[in-house]
Amino acid sequence: MMAVITEARATARYVSVSPRKTRLVIDQVRGLQAEKALAVLKFLPNKPAEAVYKTIASAVANAEENLGLSRNDLVVSEIRADEGPRRQWRRFGARGRFKPITRKTSHITVVLTEKVS
């Protein structure tokens, strides 16, 4: 007998925001219903909020299209921001020196499950 899949995933990779700042945003929506999480993220002013919003919206669309689940029954069961590769380059400074610059990236993963009634 095959198990019924009731979880939808979405991943945003190489997002140009630091994982630390992204984790501050995702801690606010972990465990919420998907619709409520999207409403909360819509009004957050942080840059990572937009990337997290898009990833959760993508997971909701995956659940509706691929699994036929209702968006009202979905809960953010797992959400995480992992470190992506760092882009490094240098700016030239005074006296022949250079200043290294590092741009951090994140991989955002969202797992939605169906709410148990």
Describe the residue ranges of each PLM region.
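Structured, basic alpha/beta domains of bacterial-type, RNA-associated proteins
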Residues: 2-17, 23-28, 32-117
